[in-house]
């Protein structure tokens, strides 16, 4: 994922909050993070047993927009108040992709990271992060329950981080150019030739899961039950679908501003998006777009603050995890960045009182339609044993797909 901070425009963009279908089935919303029997062992890393005084410093790896200190906008600053309250000086390093974040955490120079689900299991099983003692993070108690103990942020019922914010990957289309209104991801897969050269897709190996989700609904013979748990045959089918899609794709995007530009210029008329992108395009009034969750359901992301296994400043990191999930600050981050806050009390603190409705912040049913990004591992996430393909294999295949 490659994202940058934005000022939100939800009041102007309510029209984009279109659910394309009430269907979508179960996404595994009740699945916990417990590994299957005979699954890989998690490296033993002790969790903090008690909270002490801050060490005076905190070194973070984070997505742009997650540690704002007033530099980008003097009215947007939750870092300096944190420093004043705790005595922990924040030094943050922007990670542009999940792969870059994993590499930075391997350096041992950082106390914590705001990891997306396509990085979390790599960090956990790599022994790079520690389990979190949630009793030491008071604001965790009121984090949305549907974000706790999930496959991307916990193992064996043990949380390995504190949920920060989340969002769905939506299907967006120009409703002046695309007719009839699509209700299925088939519009960018089997029927994509109708919009040849105008289709856009997310540029990451994790996008293979979007193809797998589509096949899960339309090719039951493949027996896909989790789009992040693909054996070789299932992966080959997803790769074949994406290679067929490739000839119709005009642009792959990872920087959200590029997709905004593509839809506004007319270079793209249909493809995967985030709510914030739909909001921006709608607000700019350069293209008429609608976006929502198709009938198959969708993938999405939920970011997690994780503490390094060998954090030099663990007390400051725990203080940060509690601070960033406090109601007022979590609301600030969500509105600045353009995502649903994890904190259930944050919706009372947003400046735009329609914000949480637009982002479905408290909507468990909406969340349950989402297969959140989870790192593919050889040990199948659906419990089939060691027959699945891992993230490294997906990365190789993604390179081949793009050609």
Residue ranges and their predicted role:
Residues 303, 307-374:
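Mature extracytoplasmic/periplasmic domains
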């Amino acid at each position: 994922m490659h994202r940058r901070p934005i000022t939100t425009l939800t009041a102007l963009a309510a029209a984009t909050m279109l659910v394309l279908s009430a269907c979508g089935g179960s996404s595994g919303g009740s699945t916990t993070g417990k590994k299957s029997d005979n699954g890989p062992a998690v490296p033993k890393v002790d969790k903090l047993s008690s909270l002490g005084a801050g060490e005076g410093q905190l070194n973070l790896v984070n997505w742009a927009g997650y540690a704002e200190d007033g530099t980008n906008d003097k009215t947007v600053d939750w870092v300096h108040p944190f420093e004043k309250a705790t005595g922990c000086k924040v030094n943050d390093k922007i990670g542009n992709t999940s792969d870059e974040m994993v590499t930075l955490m391997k350096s041992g120079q950082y106390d914590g990271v705001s990891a997306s689900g396509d990085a979390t299991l790599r960090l956990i099983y790599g022994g790079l992060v520690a389990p979190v003692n949630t009793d030491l993070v008071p604001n965790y108690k009121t984090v949305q329950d549907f974000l706790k103990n999930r496959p991307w942020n916990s193992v064996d019922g043990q949380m390995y981080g504190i949920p920060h914010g989340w969002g769905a990957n939506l299907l967006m289309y120009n409703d002046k150019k695309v007719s009839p209104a699509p209700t299925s991801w088939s519009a960018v897969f089997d029927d994509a030739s109708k919009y040849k050269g105008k289709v856009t897709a997310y540029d990451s190996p994790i996008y293979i899961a979007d193809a797998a989700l589509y096949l899960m609904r339309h090719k039951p013979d493949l027996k896909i039950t989790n789009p992040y748990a693909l054996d070789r045959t299932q992966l080959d089918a997803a790769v074949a679908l994406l290679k067929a899609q490739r000839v119709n794709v005009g642009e792959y995007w990872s920087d959200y501003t590029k997709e905004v530009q593509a839809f506004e210029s007319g270079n793209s008329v249909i493809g995967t998006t985030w709510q914030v992108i739909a909001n921006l395009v709608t607000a700019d009034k350069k293209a008429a777009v609608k976006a929502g969750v198709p009938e198959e359901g969708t993938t999405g992301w939920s970011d997690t603050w994780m503490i390094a296994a060998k954090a030099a400043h663990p007390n400051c990191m725990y203080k940060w995890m509690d601070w960033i999930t406090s109601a007022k600050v979590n609301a600030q981050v969500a509105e600045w960045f353009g995502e649903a806050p994890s904190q259930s009390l944050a919706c009372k603190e947003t400046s735009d009182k329609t914000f949480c409705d637009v982002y479905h912040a408290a909507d468990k049913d909406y969340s349950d339609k989402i297969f959140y990004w989870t790192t593919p591992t050889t040990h199948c996430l659906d419990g089939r044993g060691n027959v699945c393909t891992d993230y490294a294999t997906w990365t190789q295949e993604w390179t081949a797909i793009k050609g």
